[in-house]
Amino acid sequence: MSQDVFKHLTSKQVQRTRARSFGASFERPLASFLPKKENKNLLSNAARVKLLTFSSSSPYSFSYSPVLSRDANDGYIPLDTSSRANLWESVTDYDLQHANEPLVGNYYISTEALGDGLNRSPFTINPEKRRSLSDISYVPIPHKEHSNWPVHCSSQAIVTTSNTTFSIWSANDYFCLLFGYAGSQLNRHSVFDIFPKSFSSHLSNLIVSFPIDNEHERILFCGDVFPVITVDGVRLMDFWVKEKQGKLIWILEFVEESYIDIKLQDGVAVDERTEQPLTSDLLPSRLPKTWDQRLYLTTKTTEGYYCPSMIYPLSKSSFQYIIFHYAAGLLFINSDFKIISLNEALFESMLGYSDLLTKDISLIFPDFKLVLQQLADSHALDPGRVVSEIHVRHAYRTCTADKMKKADYPYLIHSDGNIIQIDCQIISVSPHSVKSNEPAFGVWLIFDSVDNRASDFVRSMRSSVILEEVVISDESEEEEDLSADEDYVDSEWEVVPHNIASYTTIKELGIGAYGQVKLATYKSNKVHEVILKSISKSRILLDSWMRDKDLGTVPMEISILHFLKAHSHPNIVKMITFFEDNENYYLLTEPQKPGIDLFDYIELKPSISEKESKAIFFQIALAVAHLHSFDIIHRDIKDENVILEGNGCARLIDFGSSSLTKNGPFDTFRGTVGFAAPELLRGEKYLGKEQDIWALGILLYTIVYRENPYYNIEEILDAKLRIPFELSKDNVDLICRMLDRNVHDRITIEETLQHHWFDDIRYLDTSHIRIPLSS
């Protein structure tokens, strides 16, 4: 079974099924937890059907491959997220909060459910919630300390290369940001330039050892962890690499970790940052010399918990000590409790074992059989049912009540002998099967060091002699104001302060790779509320600067919004002004109050009528037509970037990815992967307008069907568009024409506005087409 499907089966009713790119609750992508390797003699064809192994052309509801391997031809690259379980939450408190929940959820695996053509997600607890590969998860921005910041646009760095020379053909902006590349210079680099020299030769030899296959598709890596050199130093990233039609598609994602860079000085291990010796009990007696000799171990926190850890060499005398904050993986066992499928790369990082296939699960989960028996006695293991982590905890406490417990939670045994407390979810696949090659149960294991406890422990493990850091209470107030001497005067907004110290934050709206977004007021006049976006100068890509005849050299976003201020449109956000200091640009836009973004609106509405869908979408199409008439492209059209005001006006916001067509053709794509056109993922150069149309098609599909049409890169590239139901013939025709994979046949924005679906509203007052905001 795919980790995406399992995640969807086991998501809690109180949790969202989609994460946000800004302002979301902390969530972790499950992309690294697909089962990677299988023993082909263990899994029968019947088992594959039960595990939802359908090709991308399958008519069934899900089209994921449960097992990805280096010689697989039908594997999919994961692009989804999952909610994190709070491992450290009090069991008693949790039980009280969920006392009225049934023992197991009412979700089943069945071919009838899979064949339900009207419901893409038959297993969801709340079918009115949506899933989307556009989900943006919180991952650490490259920095010396672990950070729980969400990354705007995409938490995944994506790059397309040749499968022979490994030269870079195209990449997304997040890849360029992480590695300091200009989009116009990508083709000068090989993908191996991002790796440490000592490791790049190892990886290149490994990839070259795979015979080239230009006719078939296969997964080379899935969830493997490799070191890379970012602009902020060496970091670990999860890798998924797929070979397809003579090219390699690479997806990179940061590992949630804390780390210490170590160097040896006269035989003493020293923290490179503090130049102080490390405590003697921190390191093993013998350090690895090569990547293949990397050490997997556990680290005990100050609170007594153990975290999975790793040590690997950077050079002969320098090393990196990693403490993993989060790990989760899916494995399958047969009726004899032998492991028959798992992601080996993941479990090696998590538990230090590289050979768990065919081993008894008791090797790593000694109480599993007792827990399973307890659940069986409660009739919780009917075929197809999923047992949540809280009920597994309850079963664990019950079955271990009469013996000395090693932990308050279910736990795994690391290869070094220490225990790692985890949460566990169990799905009953074929519990009564006696075939050794057929899965009886799927087991989802989750380790989560919540609230940066591992990060705090890294600081506590350093030598007691640590240099004190100076803390400045409000650095921004000390900075020199580089903007105009006089405050900006607007007829509506009166005097707008041009100093960040003059603003009071009302609410944090989001933190991204490029800066922050806040709802703020003037300290001198708190009646006025503004959206205040800070843009870090150090993180602006080289290709994102614009020489503006009025403003000088400024970020592209500011230049375009300044132009649109003079050429305004009622369905486009309006900039008030901007200013800067030594570190940031500050962009002020009008707040849309009262208002709600389209993402939340779709989530909260039980249904959206055709009239309402049409009114919302037509306004956004008008906004895009206005942009395209000035050769401006948005490049990040999605439901999160559409605000619905209380009066029914829909506005397009967030121009952080926008550009001008004259700067094209482009080889660096921006925005959200779930709304990316297939030609972008194929590494082709693009002009921009056609890609905005594709994103509009995804947006309309999302409004109508409450889900994204494509759940992974494979589907974006090849899958046939699935229409769950027909809202109207004209609506379906418009969606299909916008989502035409042939760029040259794709409808234009002018043709979109002239489509028959809009015949009944086209000649109304387009300045404010009222949306019937029904409850």
Curated annotation (Swiss-Prot):
PROSITE patterns, sorted: PROTEIN_KINASE_ATP (PS00107), PROTEIN_KINASE_DOM (PS50011), PROTEIN_KINASE_ST (PS00108)
Signal sequence, renumbered to the chain: none
Biological process according to GO: intracellular signal transduction; negative regulation of glycogen biosynthetic process; regulation of establishment or maintenance of cell polarity
SUPFAM superfamilies: Protein kinase-like (PK-like) (SSF56112), PYP-like sensor domain (PAS domain) (SSF55785)
Active site: 636
EC number: 2.7.11.1
Keyword annotations from UniProtKB, A to Z: ATP-binding, Cytoplasm, Kinase, Nucleotide-binding, Nucleus, Phosphoprotein, Serine/threonine-protein kinase, Transferase
Annotated family: Belongs to the protein kinase superfamily. Ser/Thr protein kinase family.
Name of protein: Serine/threonine-protein kinase ppk6
Organism: Schizosaccharomyces pombe (strain 972 / ATCC 24843) (Fission yeast)
Gene name per UniProt: ppk6
